Amino acid sequence: MLFHGSRHSPEGAQPRRIRGYAPGVTFTEPVDTPLALLLLGQGSDAGSERGVDCPGELPAASDPNLAARAEAAKRQLGERLFVLGHHYQRDEVIRFADVTGDSFKLAREAAARPDAEFIVFCGVHFMAESADILTSAAQQVLLPDLAAGCSMADMATHQQVLEAWDVLTDAGVADRTVPVTYMNSSAAIKGFTGAHGGTVCTSSNAERALRWALERGGSPDRKVLFLPDQHLGRNTAVRELGLGLDDCVVFDPHKPGGGLTTRQLRDATMLLWRGHCSVHGRFTAENVADVRSRVPGVQVLVHPECRHEVVEAADFVGSTEYIIRTIEAAEPGSSWAIGTELNLVRRLASAHPDKQIVFLEKTVCYCSTMNRIDLPHLVWTLESLVAGGVVNRITVEPTVAANARVALDRMLALP
């Protein structure tokens, strides 16, 4: 059983055995190519990141002292520094995190450390924005690589959502529609949501957020505009709230009127934004059937950002934290196929060698933008702080931050 890395790896890359995988299970390590990262990072040339030049000079990735340099910088900064690491980060980066977790946990951890002057967020852009919103003005949030964005978050721009709201207004349904935005969205979208009476949600509390939205004001014909991930919205509505698939319609911001008729907008309960996760959206029902045929007794565990047919075919569905807890509690000798980002799957396999843990898809799939945060960028960020410089600071405009904070606070107050 070979996990091929042909889409990401140069010809001749060697497969590597990972502890915790069943005998004979190998995969070829993906190698990030400048072209792939350029496209995902939205830069205009290979020397820029997200269209913004990277100031300073990065340490060479081949420097054998990178880890020691990171440790030394952390020691010098002491309590002034707090490093956050998302579960999807590389091993070389996650080892330096003071706290690991999903996006919302990390944002809350940042807010709980008012003594930390510098918060280095090893994640992606929207996560650093949320940390900036939830922390004090005296704290500075830094993102080691500005090209570490999120394709899903980028699928819903503020202008697109404003235009969508105009469509709902023209259809006569805006006054009974509550926006619910996934944590994986920009600060501008969270701000829109807060200003229009809505809330933020995570993959672990999406059910509570949707129930709150549909019950808001006691109106029996409430609607939800769920963005930017259609799959999480659909899976939660159908599996947790008991709605039918025909109660959900997809609003496509690239089509006039969202590609929907006025009747469709009025009849639907869930207006799902046409967005998805580039990693979780890759998994298919065929992947589930294939792994069941190859691994006897395998239990399939997937993230709710997966397509509805994948979630329906799986045995267990839950957030990143749920996936981790499920594997930790699993019986020794049990077999698992996990449908989420590869860095986390590999880390779980390594941490639980008494269980057979495999990636749901044969082709390896990292979150390429998350994977941009590497050790050279982390060392550059930390050493810049030691030298008295602040690089790649993430700040959210005060009005946007205030409205986004309203939406985040509504989530925290959910019953």
Where are these regions (language model features)?
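Low-complexity, intrinsically disordered/propeptide-like segments
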Residues: 5-6, 42
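Active-site loop-to-helix "anion-binding N-cap" substructures in soluble metabolic enzymes
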Residues: 16-20, 24-339, 344-415
